[in-house]
């Protein structure tokens, strides 16, 4: 399952929508909830990012992300 993680680069400042960035993770999970938990844990262990939201991408949404050219999987 591919998850899109929305985050701020630092926890030091208040989140601002215009500074929100995203990364994509391929997570092996039995359920959507388990995948969200694993994704948050991975990001928190490997970065200082402030995670805002984690979204499971549907096939159509994933295709759209690939078409726009912003899709690249992040590996830790």
UniProtKB/Swiss-Prot annotation:
Record GO terms (molecular function): DNA binding; DNA-directed RNA polymerase activity
Q: Which UniProt keywords apply?
A: DNA-directed RNA polymerase, Nucleotidyltransferase, Transcription, Transferase
Question: Under which main EC class is this enzyme filed?
Answer: transferase
Q: List the GO cellular component terms.
A: DNA-directed RNA polymerase complex
Catalysis: reaction(s): RNA(n) + a ribonucleoside 5'-triphosphate = RNA(n+1) + diphosphate
Give yes or no: UniProt keyword Hydrolase.
no
Which EC number(s) does UniProt give? 2.7.7.6
Tree of life domain: Bacteria
Q: Name one GO biological process term.
A: DNA-templated transcription
Q: How does it assemble?
A: RNAP is composed of a core of 2 alpha, a beta and a beta' subunit. The core is associated with a delta subunit, and at least one of epsilon or omega. When a sigma factor is associated with the core the holoenzyme is formed, which can initiate transcription.
Q: Which family does it belong to?
A: Belongs to the RNA polymerase subunit epsilon family.
Q: What does this protein do?
A: A non-essential component of RNA polymerase (RNAP).
Q: Note the NCBIfam families from the entry.
A: PRK13667.1
Q: What is this protein called?
A: DNA-directed RNA polymerase subunit epsilon
